């Protein structure tokens, strides 16, 4: 594993964690929301991560 692929892996992990924290912050901000703009009640959001399979660029 080269330096750039290590940096890319770290960057991907940090981006995923930022998304997770953004969703948590949004859920906390809407904890007392009783009605959405569509008229229904607020439902918490979830982040679901899935593995990303990337083939090497030389193949």
UniProtKB/Swiss-Prot annotation:
Disulfide bonds: none
Chief place of localization: other
Keyword Ligase: no
TM segment ranges: none
Cellular localisation: Bacterial flagellum basal body
Keyword Kinase: no
Keywords noted in UniProt: Bacterial flagellum
Alphabetical list of InterPro entries matching this protein: Flag_bb_rod_N (IPR001444), Flagellar_basal_body_rod_CS (IPR019776)
Any single Gene Ontology cellular-component annotation: bacterial-type flagellum basal body
Family: Belongs to the flagella basal body rod proteins family.
Quaternary structure annotation from Swiss-Prot or TrEMBL: The basal body constitutes a major portion of the flagellar organelle and consists of four rings (L,P,S, and M) mounted on a central rod. The rod consists of about 26 subunits of FlgG in the distal portion, and FlgB, FlgC and FlgF are thought to build up the proximal portion of the rod with about 6 subunits each.
Name this polypeptide is given: Flagellar basal-body rod protein FlgC
Annotated organism of origin: Borrelia hermsii
Recorded name of the encoding gene: flgC
């Amino acid at each position: 594993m080269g330096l750039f692929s290590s940096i890319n892996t770290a960057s991907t992990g940090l981006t995923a964690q930022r998304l997770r924290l953004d969703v948590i912050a949004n859920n906390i901000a809407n904890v007392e929301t009783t009605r959405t703009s569509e008229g229904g009640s607020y439902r918490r959001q979830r982040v679901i991560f899935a593995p990303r399979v990337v083939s090497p660029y030389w193949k």
